[in-house]
Swiss-Prot record:
GO term, biological process aspect, one: translation
UniProt record similarity statement: Belongs to the universal ribosomal protein uS12 family.
Name of the gene encoding the protein in the UniProt record: rpsL
PROSITE patterns referenced in this protein's UniProt entry, alphabetically: RIBOSOMAL_S12
Biological role: With S4 and S5 plays an important role in translational accuracy. Interacts with and stabilizes bases of the 16S rRNA that are involved in tRNA selection in the A site and with the mRNA backbone. Located at the interface of the 30S and 50S subunits, it traverses the body of the 30S subunit contacting proteins on the other side and probably holding the rRNA structure together. The combined cluster of proteins S8, S12 and S17 appears to hold together the shoulder and platform of the 30S subunit.
Organism for this UniProt entry: Prochlorococcus marinus subsp. pastoris (strain CCMP1986 / NIES-2087 / MED4)
UniProt name for this protein: Small ribosomal subunit protein uS12
Gene Ontology cellular component annotations, sorted alphabetically: small ribosomal subunit
Quaternary structure annotation from Swiss-Prot or TrEMBL: Part of the 30S ribosomal subunit. Contacts proteins S8 and S17. May interact with IF1 in the 30S initiation complex.
Stored InterPro entries: NA-bd_OB-fold, Ribosomal_uS12, Ribosomal_uS12_bac
The keyword RNA-binding appears for this protein: yes
Amino acid sequence: MPTISQLIGSERKRLTRKTKSPALKSCPERRGVCTRVYTSTPKKPNSALRKVARVRLTSGFEVTAYIPGIGHNLQEHSVVLLRGGRVKDLPGVRYHIIRGTLDTAGVKDRRQSRSKYGAKAPKND
């Protein structure tokens, strides 16, 4: 605990918070180009082939981003929009690709949580 005299000499240092998504540079989303689209295996105890993409962002960073939903149309040179948000069982994956924007198609036949996967309302015939 500093004394009053010490506080007069120099003020308290402000604590700086470290961001969880530095590549976004304080923006809600960032555009980027896929450099590689591949699958990755999660940490123990989970088992799957998670779809991920390596993306070069307009901010100059190259990051790994998760492709949510079932099935996707992404390939190399696809232009995508990224948001923050990590995938707990994939180390190093701190971003999500936003479905239904730019070159990323929405999830087909999605009926619930449609807005999160860029799916249009189903036609009721």
